[in-house]
């Protein structure tokens, strides 16, 4: 009988200890805040080079830099691509001056608008964003085409989900830019 009472007392003490406010505070401390998540996302966007393709550029004395008024807004819908001779560029990949459009064996691809505007990722869910990177799906939709080169989604797909969610949080926090990016031009079309 004493052993049974002792066992219940020990179990009771353990239950109280495991559910103490201190434990709950420690668990909450382990979760990153929204600000921490956005800061992590900003760091990842900068180090992964997202601006290289997704931001129109302005020319400076040091060369082209991302246009601060159009950061991550993708290929400018008002920009026309120059003419080129497909025969003379044979085995090459061409980029426009902004780096937001690329021509290759896959056709012509245009960097997407990653801002939270409705013309960008404004209506995307976090799950869609993660799926687009993890599985290379256009707009993160199951029955959509694959993301086109030069988007290096295969490499980025190895990022932990928490990093992709941090990138998403950062992108949702930046200035929205209205810009409807042209559809890809696939070969033979």
Outline where the language-model segments fall.
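Positively charged n-region of N-terminal signal peptides that target proteins for export
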Residues: 1-4
């Amino acid at each position: 009988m004493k052993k049974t009472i002792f066992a219940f007392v020990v179990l009771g003490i353990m239950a109280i200890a495991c559910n103490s406010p201190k434990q709950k505070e420690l668990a909450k401390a382990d979760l990153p805040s929204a600000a921490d998540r956005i800061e992590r996302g900003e760091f990842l966007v900068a180090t992964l080079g997202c601006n290289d393709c997704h931001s129109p550029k302005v020319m400076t004395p040091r060369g082209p830099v991302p246009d601060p008024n159009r950061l991550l807004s993708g290929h400018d819908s008002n920009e026309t691509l120059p003419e080129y001779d497909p025969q003379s560029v044979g085995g090459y990949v061409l980029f426009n001056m902004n780096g937001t459009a690329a021509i290759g064996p896959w056709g012509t691809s245009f960097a997407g608008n990653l801002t939270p505007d409705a013309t960008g990722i404004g209506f995307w869910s976090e799950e869609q964003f993660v799926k687009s990177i993890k599985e290379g799906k256009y707009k993160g939709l199951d029955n959509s085409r694959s993301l086109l080169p030069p988007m290096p989604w295969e490499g980025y797909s190895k990022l932990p989900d928490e990093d992709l969610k941090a990138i998403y949080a950062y992108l949702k926090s930046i200035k929205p830019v209205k810009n409807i990016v042209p559809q890809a031009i696939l070969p033979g079309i």
